[in-house]
């Protein structure tokens, strides 16, 4: 995934209603589209099968997704799943089934240290702003505003990355 805007011209992922200003447009509405899901090959600790965490065989499927090809995880700690800089995701996130699974503004799953994420904003999202399922990179500057239904930043599983400890130090 490559989404590289600039400070003056950020990349904006939004809903069709927001772009077209269609009749009935609910400006600043939430749940108008699913959000971004980035699947990488970095080590995870929750394997779908009886595999050893951190090995190539240790893979999983993002919660609620039924496509068996939508796998993340592996053994590439420096996995490069792209670059997302100066990017805003807005009006995303929604429940995808009745078991409580939902899509977030951005879901990073098995994304490694080779992935660059800087100056990202998730605005008016219906679920978590950003959720991590095994993330080994530096998540940079991430802003979560208008994400009042759930949380802004969530690490679902995996060993906390150094960036999480840095985030904790800033907040504490």
What are these regions (language model features)?
Residues 1-172:
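Beta-strand/loop edge motif enriched in small/polar residues
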């Amino acid at each position: 995934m490559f989404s590289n805007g600039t400070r003056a011209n950020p990349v904006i992922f939004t809903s069709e209603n927001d772009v077209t200003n269609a009749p009935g447009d609910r400006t600043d509405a939430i749940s108008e589209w699913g959000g971004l899901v980035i699947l990488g090959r970095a080590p995870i600790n929750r394997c779908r099968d009886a595999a050893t965490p951190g090995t190539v065989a240790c893979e999983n499927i993002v919660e609620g997704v039924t496509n068996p090809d939508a796998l993340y995880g592996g053994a590439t700690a420096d996995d490069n799943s792209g670059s997302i800089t100066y990017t805003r995701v807005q009006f995303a996130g929604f429940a995808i089934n009745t078991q409580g699974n939902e899509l977030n503004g951005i879901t990073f799953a098995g994304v490694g240290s080779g992935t660059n994420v800087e100056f990202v904003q998730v605005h008016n999202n219906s679920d978590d702003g950003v959720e991590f399922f095994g993330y080994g990179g530096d998540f940079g500057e991430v802003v979560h505003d208008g994400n009042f239904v759930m949380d802004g930043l969530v690490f679902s599983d995996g060993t906390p990355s150094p960036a999480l400890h840095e985030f904790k130090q800033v907040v504490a």
